[in-house]
Amino acid sequence: MQSSTTIFTRFFFSLKRWSIVFMILLLLGGGATELWAKKLRVAVLKFGTVNWELNVIEHHGFAKAEGVELEVVKLASKNATAVALQSGSVDMIVTDWVWVSRQRADGEDLTFFPYSLAVGSLMVAQGSGIRSFKDLQGKRLGIAGGPVDKSWLLICALAQKQEGIDLNASVEKVFGAPPLLNQQILSGKLDAVINFWHYIARLKAQGLKPLVTIGKAIVTLGAGSDVPMLGYVFREKWANANKGIVKGFARSSRRAKALLADSQAEWDRLRPEMKAKDDATFNALRDGYLDGIPSSWGAVERKAAKGLFAVLTKQGGKKLVGKSLKFQSGTFWPHITY
């Protein structure tokens, strides 16, 4: 039987050993956080297209290869993902950098790195005869996303710049949910529609043509470069303490994109997730995703984004960007470039 003195001595040295470990972790600072906090919780829309990329990352173990344990949290709405991030329930979501700048102006330390260039287009009905913004005057135009939808604001700015037309005053605006707007233009109840890219892809599969893409609008309005509007968004303080996790996930995202760009077999594997009813829809969705892959992200793209923010601010005002009309420093996380 061990004496109480022996037990106490062992306890003392054990406590001393763990105290040393604790002091080392304190000295490591942010590195200590990275050492233990390997899980990354990403909230996405349940049926969002980002699920395709995350599926590839998980299926091929790309995140695991970076030492990141990826947990995908599927939610019912965009607002739900934002609430999850702001409450700390998840670490990352996918949204646009205009929202990030607005949140930073309100004191939130959110930041962004790119996910996709894909945003949408202005599509016209078959046989509509619409070939210019002038032809849109007096027509019924469906708009997804509401009065301060960024695609709608960019189209308005482009119409004013190219043809001197105030679209906001000259078209009959019909705001609605993306699937409903697609149904209405296909049934002849709308003359044109502005919708998100994956809904546009489904319209292309039905033979509809774009009057203008949002990507073209961005470049024409003076950005001078394609600007990724959508990206992975997270808290700056958390990211700075967990750079290995964020940068590792970013590499796994790029790796998934590269595989999708090169492998038709990978798309065939994903097809059940894409809800494509026929080959034309499947091909349009695939091509739309691939067209949205950013090729570079550096000083040029960041500068272009700031110029685009000025255009959006002029069109949407405080209803879009919040109380500050200035693009907020730190909106783009500086530790990822390519």
Q: What is each residue range found by the language model?
A:
Residues 3-20:
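Bacterial N-terminal signal peptides that target proteins for export
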Residues 18-30:
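Bacterial N-terminal signal peptides
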Residues 31-37:
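Sec/Tat signal peptide C-region and signal peptidase I cleavage site
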Residues 38-175, 184-187, 191-197, 211:
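Short, glycine-/small- and polar/acidic-enriched structural segments
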Residues 65, 215-225, 291-301:
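Short, solvent-exposed loop/beta-turn-alpha elements that line the ligand-binding surface or hinge
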Residues 97-98, 174, 179-272:
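Pocket-lining segment of extracytoplasmic ligand-binding domains
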Residues 239-316:
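Secondary-structure end/capping motifs
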Residues 306-338:
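Conserved C-terminal helix/tail region of periplasmic/extracytoplasmic solute-binding proteins
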